[in-house]
Amino acid sequence: MYENLKSLGIQEPTSVDSYTLRQEANHDILKIYFKKQKGEFFAKSVKFKYPRQRKTMLVDSGTHEYKDVTEINANLKYVVDELDNLTQGVHIQADPDIKQKILRDLRHLEKVVQNKISEIERDLEKL
């Protein structure tokens, strides 16, 4: 059982506490956290980087337009399935991180747009 995790070098899959999965450019980053042992200040973790699989898909059959898309690596799917069985959904903790990043990006965008509007208004006043 848990052959995919063992192939990654995780000899004791039952020691897995949680995991996060995120996408960076053309890679998926899987970080696995282990249960904290007595006397440890921080739980141990390991990180794995998987290239995303590229596919060319037909978008419009009338114009024969194709689009390049990426999707999760097939091996990573199996690893995530095993991690889900072990953690029973504990990986959900990564969602607030994503939400916070999106909120920070949104606030930054608001500032950029507001500064641009102010700049355009100043230019208009000069006319």
Curated annotation (Swiss-Prot):
InterPro entries in the cross-refs: UPF0325
A Pfam family it matches = DUF3461
Q: NCBIfam families, per this entry? A: PRK13677.1 (NF010213)
Family assignment from sequence similarity: Belongs to the UPF0325 family.
Protein name as it appears in the record = UPF0325 protein ASA_3165
